[in-house]
A protein has these predicted regions:
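Noncatalytic partner-interaction/assembly domains of nucleic-acid and motor enzyme complexes
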Residues: 1-111, 164
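Surface-exposed polar/charged interaction patches
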Residues: 92, 125-128, 155
Length: 164
């Protein structure tokens, strides 16, 4: 599977260190669960969203508490409790100011995973389905790829505005 675990961790680590709730909310609005290949990262992302929606601060302590409340803490590996995992996320970004760049890397890998998924599905449909089914799957996959490319283009525009 195509993934960017270091960029995922760096992005989440930046959000754990962002002091302005509006900044965190803005970045959370730009990502989807499917952008993250690591289910632990998805759990942290979900905890962050829950906290922001409740008007609570997002930091390692509040996120760990939310993971516990939601019962997701068990998702963390046996040798790495949620607190240790979150500490690793805090240490992941070389520069908190590069959060937008980490997000771009995550989104680029999302597009690549979408292409990979579509390619596998189209291969399967080509080998074993009717042409009508193949056309439907092709259209659906094309629409999803266009959506993902659109998200990437929107982020590229935002990135250009942030660097100026």
């Amino acid at each position: 599977m195509i993934a960017a675990p270091a960029a995922e961790a760096a992005f989440l680590g930046c959000l754990l260190q962002t002091r302005a709730a509006t900044g965190t909310r803005g970045y959370l609005a730009q990502v989807e669960d499917g952008d993250f290949a690591d289910p632990r990262h998805v759990a942290v992302l979900t905890a962050m969203r829950t906290l922001v929606e409740a008007g609570s601060p997002v930091d390692p302590i509040t996120v760990e508490g939310q993971l516990r409340r939601s019962g997701v803490e068990a998702l963390m590996t046996a040798d790495k409790r949620a607190a240790v995992f979150l500490a690793d996320l805090l240490a992941a970004p070389p520069s908190v100011g590069s959060v937008g760049h980490y997000l771009m890397i995550v989104l680029e890998h999302t597009v690549r995973r979408s292409i990979e998924t579509a390619a596998v599905r189209l291969q399967q449909v080509a080998e074993s389905s009717s042409l009508d089914d193949a056309r439907d799957v092709t259209r659906t996959d094309y629409q999803e790829l266009e959506r993902q490319f659109g998200r990437l283009a929107a982020r590229e525009c935002a990135e250009g505005g942030e660097s100026q």
